[in-house]
Amino acid sequence: MRLLPLLVPLALTVPGCVPAGSQTPPPNVVAQAEVRDERELIVLTKPPADTLIQEAEALGYELRAVHPLDELGDMLVVFRIPEGRTIAEAIEETERAVPGVTAGAHHLYRIQSTLPADHDYATALIGWPEGGCKALRRVGLIDAGVAPGHPALSDGRVAQERFVPGEAPPSTSHGTLMAELLVGPGKLRDTTVYSAVVVDPVANGGDAAGVTSILRSINWMRGEGVELVNISLAGPRNKLMNRALGQASEDGMILVAAAGNLGPTAPPQYPAAFPFSLAVTAVDREGAVYRRAVQGDHIDVAAPGVDILISSEGRLRVSSGTSVAAPFVTAVLAADPSLSAEDVGTVRDKLLQRTVDLGQPGPDETYGAGLISAPPDC
């Protein structure tokens, strides 16, 4: 491993060098997928949704909800699956009955950090200035809630919208940590973070987000003019996510996603493994990859993500995970004019000039293009 100059802050392993961000077909091995409800079917269709609803109800499906996704050009429709049919059967039946729709399961996407995991080395490792950097792009955060009035967020503003069902107070621990890494003291300044609360504080252990919440949050952010989105959640491949997030990417939104913490031999996690996302892995102070990080040819870039010091609820705590690494990349992209672009392919190419190579020479499946570095002048 190359020595890192102090100036500078998840997939199956295949030998050899692979261009950062290159994609292979989905592997035969897939991650074990969690679903919110085995009797729930999610469908995306171009508006109006009348034909879809009529055909589905004729087949015995019960309409649960309709959510317009105007900014993405779709309608999100939720059905209850009839007794005796599996999700796979329901997907195939619905897509056959109404050509052009995309049907899928209500998969869950979990937070990718561990608490607790010694010093605040991260900003020095990537060369981030002590006074922080001015944000040049509007930033979004898809995560748990951000605690209002948190003292560590006095340098940044947060506009928050809730996309989870029910009225239980949102979980704010992880979302606040991510917001601090983006707009806390010495981070991005002169900006507002658009925080989408998608992690359900009640269902499925309280650390998971459903597909519908994520898609509705992306639609909201498009309407707010958000250009750069941080997603520290990971889960299975989902056709609905592919369609909606892919459309947002085509419209110029850059998605920065945690690679996942299932380990180096685990299958790719999504949305990081989608070709339109920037997949972020985590490294420690020595530049060694986080031992639980997912690896693969979809990994784009590395950032500090092991034993990261963060203030939380009036005390300091240490956190590790690809979830923690992603905001460092998001912050650099927001502040560095040389990385400003409307398509992820251009950003991916430019990262080769804004990273420090790690591991074997050139881009690889462990570190991607290498360790992200802060803009020289911000």
Regions found by a protein language model. Give the residues of each.
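Bacterial N-terminal signal peptides
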Residues: P5-P15
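C-terminal subdomain of the subtilisin-like protease fold in secreted/lumenal serine endopeptidases
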Residues: C17-Q23, P27-A33, R222, V226-L233, ...
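Inhibitory N-terminal propeptides of secreted protease zymogens
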Residues: S22-Q112, V226-L228
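Protease zymogen maturation seam
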Residues: D70-G73, E89-G156, T366
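Subtilisin-like serine protease catalytic core
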Residues: W128-V139, A144-A159, G166-V211, F274-P275, ...
